[in-house]
């Protein structure tokens, strides 16, 4: 089980990414459309002025139940251990155990 501080830190990062997403995208778009280096530098400085945790790459994929970061399934948002337990308990609709 991950520490609660790590889970809360990741939630805070997710909130910041949602808050600054449109501003960050518009700055990147304007920076790519400009031709002069000076204008690009201005947009680059504006991007750097945004909070560091507002970048999407800072979010870590962690299981929302256990907080485990390794063996994470993106489609379900849980780790493989939790996935297995929930599948055996029939808590994930549409999943069947294969046998041949």
Swiss-Prot record:
It is found in: Plastid, Chloroplast. InterPro entries: Ribosomal_uS14, Ribosomal_uS14_bac/plastid. The keyword Chloroplast applies. Pfam families: Ribosomal_S14. Coiled coil: none annotated. The keyword Ribonucleoprotein applies. Its main location: plastid. One of its GO terms (molecular function) is rRNA binding. GO terms for cellular component: chloroplast; small ribosomal subunit. One of its GO terms (biological process) is translation. Keywords: Chloroplast, Plastid, Ribonucleoprotein, Ribosomal protein, RNA-binding, rRNA-binding. Part of the 30S ribosomal subunit. Belongs to the universal ribosomal protein uS14 family. This is Small ribosomal subunit protein uS14c.
